[in-house]
Amino acid sequence: MRRLLPGPDLEDPDLAQLYQYPPGRWLRANMVSSADGAASHEGATAALSSRGDRHVFALLRTLADVIVAGAATVRAERYAPVRRRELWDHLREGRPPTPPIAVLSARLDLDPASRLIASAPPHARTIVITTATAPPERRAELAERADVIVAGRETVDLNTAVDALADRGYRRLLAEGGPQLLGQLVAAGLLDELCLTIGPLLAGPGASRIVAGAVSPRPLPLRLAHVLEDNGFLLCRYVIKDHLSPNEPWCAPPPASSWGPRLRFSSAGAAWFTAAYSMGAAAGRAQTRSPRRRRGR
């Protein structure tokens, strides 16, 4: 056992280094939770966030090649195309100004006139991932305004979907929801990393867990890569155990520097230690990240 806090303060360049993707294809999920795992408090998620959390949320979107979400999450949260002013603009150098959003929908229950589809810029057209049995007329209608990928016959095959995205050059993936999608990613062995913000409050019972779907036969071991602290909010970054070696240069902490008031780094050298939790037990009940809910906090 060792004390992680307090640790050295960091500056934005150090923060960007902490969250850089490793080489190759990598799928990261981003969640938020109260200390007791609740998804919201009194119907809102504002109490679960902080300035530093929102700062990292924007960074994760900036670093991603594509943002992946399920159709139910997109409809419930009224997704819109990512706006350039929301990102760390200098970190997009050499890439399109904003990442596209990829929506998974087996039945294509999506509105072609929605902002997400109709207002997407040419460099980041919305991607719709569907099935071979989806209504052909709906597929043709959506294909006029979005890029459509067929992955699977009756249900979306996530391995095929992720391969198709990688073939298009989208190798750094960020999953923002929902719990069903995250559960399917875990079951398919596609999840590489979980970023989880834990807010310092007890919200009480009532929210769903971080992962939905079939019960896992055993807990999924995680490695804790780092913890950041922002006024009591803990920003944890876990990597699926054995997906990376502890000796990878990508795992090493940044140099200590004078950081500013927002976040503090709380990792012990390049060492890793295994989280003694499953994704459900570690996070309890958590909120998938959505731009609408986070802007409304």
Descriptions of predicted regions:
Residues 1-253, 263, 293-297:
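Enzymes that bind and transform nitrogen-containing heteroaromatic metabolites
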Residues 247-248, 252, 256, 279-284:
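N-terminal compositionally biased or targeting/leader segments
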